[in-house]
């Protein structure tokens, strides 16, 4: 953590019951629909590509975003923005462009 405030904010979020409930729902729903989400994502990849060709982190970000888009009432623009932020933080340099493109095709 960069500073003391960021550390405190993290613990506040961890103790937020609504956030924990949503997080558990998100993980369970993503797992329950794993195969159908993979097929949907694959449909929008470059011709000849499979989802196994992209990194595990990119897969995870896409799967969770697809779950949020299809199964929740969250605004699609917000979901895509969060996915792009996560890709910038946890993936290769240009992965966020790829994630953004795939999710925009899905919505």
Predicted features along the sequence, with ranges:
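N-terminal interaction/assembly modules
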Residues: 1-96, 100-107
């Amino acid at each position: 953590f960069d500073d003391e405030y960021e550390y405190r904010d993290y613990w506040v979020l961890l103790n937020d019951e609504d956030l924990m409930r949503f997080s558990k729902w998100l993980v369970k729903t993503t797992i329950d629909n794993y195969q159908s989400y993979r097929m949907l994502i694959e449909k929008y990849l470059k011709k000849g590509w499979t989802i196994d060709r992209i990194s595990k982190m990119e897969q995870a970000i896409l799967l969770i975003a697809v779950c949020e888009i299809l199964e929740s009432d969250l605004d699609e623009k917000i979901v895509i923005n969060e996915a792009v932020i996560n890709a910038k933080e946890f993936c290769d340099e240009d992965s966020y462009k790829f994630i953004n493109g795939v999710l925009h095709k899905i919505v």
